[in-house]
């Protein structure tokens, strides 16, 4: 964040202060960057997010990011009582704020203000997908409070997504780490909001049938929230085409597919390369076991050259095996072995996320770990016990129970434990 030049490195205010804002890459900055970049960036949102996640501050600095600040979360003795005062305080301390603000006291005025923002949307030098309506008075905000996820004193209004038409050329099937196949639509290039769209997502084969899609037909394309292109339906223009075949075997390994609910799955976990490699890379990720030097490319080499088929195999790798990989010399091999050793002592929530339980993100893994305290409790939990956890619903509870009931998954976990991986238990608060 220190590489974002508009963020002040020192401020006049003395005391504890937490400010909240949003990082952006201006469209003009993106255009200038792409003129000289070896690998042009696809869009400003991804460019900003990727820059902040990058471990090299020099890469972040080259993106020339900006930021807008809009909220103070924590402050000692705030010298203001409403939003106007808060924004003025931010400005006085050198934090850039948005100039696109307006007051309203009636519903009609709110609609007018939103329409005015939308009218300026195309002329802005940064991407927006809506406008936020907020209560100004801070005491009123405090009285209204918050839900588990959102403040009750603010609501985001999303603009209608931009749409265009394209011809559906082909449908291929992408394989994820869980073995689920997801259809990917290939389209004639079409411009939506300044972005050339050539591919779009479909949910499953049932989605293809519901939308009556055919190869060669004209379809509506929408970029939801200006980010993810999706096919919303077929254009009723009399266009015809050929049926889209439902796959019966895995496109990667040729194994028979099975249906689970609305989705198709390849159950060949061990020798289906794409899902095995994706599973290894996920296991090693920063939010999972945080095994540095183990990228998806390295996972692919480990699969091809070292016989690594699931995460437990990682802990049996030798230095000699690593030195046989492309790009690995003594230091990198030693670093990976050290990272593997370090990962043996891991947080329970990180472990639960790393093993790839479907529908379990890091936040849910943290909730589940905190509730049960130990891996054994999670592995033997019933659906009813899981439903006692706030924010855990039927789908998540069923996913956990099914994961540990599958012999392949349970065996993988047991092999990890046998290899010395030890998820730390969490002390649960006493009943009294």
Segments predicted by a language model, with ranges:
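RNA/tRNA-interacting regions in translation and RNA-turnover enzymes
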Residues: 1-348, 352-359, 364-371, 385, ...
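Short, solvent-exposed loop/turn elements at beta->coil junctions and helix N-caps
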Residues: 427-431
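Solvent-exposed, charged helical/coil patches
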Residues: 399-402
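Helix-hairpin-helix/helix-loop-helix acidic hairpins
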Residues: 375-379
């Amino acid at each position: 964040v220190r590489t974002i030049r508009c963020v002040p490195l020192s401020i006049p205010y003395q005391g504890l202060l937490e400010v909240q804002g949003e990082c952006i890459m201006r469209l003009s900055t993106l255009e200038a960057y792409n003129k000289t970049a070896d690998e042009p960036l696809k869009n400003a949102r991804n460019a900003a997010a990727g820059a902040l996640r990058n471990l090299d501050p020099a890469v972040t600095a080259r993106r020339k990011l900006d930021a807008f600040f809009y909220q103070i979360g924590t402050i000692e003795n705030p010298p203001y009582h409403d939003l106007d005062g808060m924004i003025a305080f931010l400005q006085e301390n050198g934090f850039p704020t948005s100039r696109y603000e307006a007051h309203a006291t009636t519903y009609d005025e709110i609609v007018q203000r939103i329409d005015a923002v939308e009218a300026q949307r195309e002329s802005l030098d940064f991407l927006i997908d809506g406008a936020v309506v907020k209560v100004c008075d801070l005491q009123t905000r405090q009285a209204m409070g918050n839900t588990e996820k959102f403040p009750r004193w603010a609501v985001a209004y999303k603009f209608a997504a931009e749409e265009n038409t394209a011809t559906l050329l082909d449908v291929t099937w992408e394989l994820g780490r869980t073995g689920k196949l997801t259809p990917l639509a290939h389209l004639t290039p079409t411009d939506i909001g300044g972005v050339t769209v050539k591919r779009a997502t479909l949910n499953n084969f049932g989605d293809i049938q519901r939308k009556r899609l055919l190869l060669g037909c004209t379809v509506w394309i929408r970029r939801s929230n200006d980010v993810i292109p999706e096919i919303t339906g077929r254009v009723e223009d009399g266009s015809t085409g050929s049926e889209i075949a439902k796959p019966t075997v895995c496109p990667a390994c040729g194994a028979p597919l099975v249906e689970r609910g609305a989705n198709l799955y390849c159950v060949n976990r061990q020798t289906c390369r794409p899902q095995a490699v994706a599973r290894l890379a996920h296991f090693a990720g920063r939010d999972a076991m945080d095994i540095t030097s183990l990228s998806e490319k390295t996972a692919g080499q480990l699969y091809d050259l070292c016989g690594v088929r699931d995460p437990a195999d990682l802990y049996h790798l030798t230095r000699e095996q690593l030195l046989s990989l492309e790009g690995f010399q003594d230091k990198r091999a030693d670093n990976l072995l050290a990272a593997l050793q370090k990962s043996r002592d891991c947080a329970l929530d990180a472990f639960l996320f790393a093993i790839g339980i479907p529908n379990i993100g890091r936040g849910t893994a943290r909730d589940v770990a905190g509730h049960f305290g130990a891996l054994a409790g999670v592995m033997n939990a019933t659906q009813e016990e899981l439903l006692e956890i706030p924010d855990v619903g039927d789908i998540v509870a069923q996913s956990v129970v099914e994961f540990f009931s599958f012999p392949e998954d349970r065996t993988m976990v047991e092999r990890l434990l046998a290899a010395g991986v030890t998820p730390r238990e969490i002390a649960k608060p006493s009943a009294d």
